[in-house]
């Protein structure tokens, strides 16, 4: 995967720190709605999926696996925005399944102003979330400087 900046295609390894910071700033500007996590009702968690989520340091402070597990138990069956770096190339949305409690993770891709989730164009995260019923907002711990 790479990133499209100013009409040119750069691989992740070719991006300068300045380009990555610009990409980070664009992601924040384009995704202000993502400064919240969307929660549903109670349920259980699939512990195997926790190994796929190590750090949440873009919209969430860094947390250990134990802290992440506790977060899912405290606000289960939610939809969470997750990432592990300061660009939007590894941005995921994690959803708890209401029936079996498993955690489903979909990769988010931003192409210009459009949002693609697993290849489908939703234009914005808000449009994607409108496909679900009974969501309410829960504030994220936002840690831009660490």
Curated annotation (Swiss-Prot):
Factors inducing expression: Expressed in the early phase of the viral replicative cycle.
Keywords of the record: Early protein
Role, per record: Plays a role in virus cell tropism, and may be required for efficient virus replication in macrophages.
Family classification: Belongs to the asfivirus MGF 100 family.
Protein name: Protein MGF 100-3L
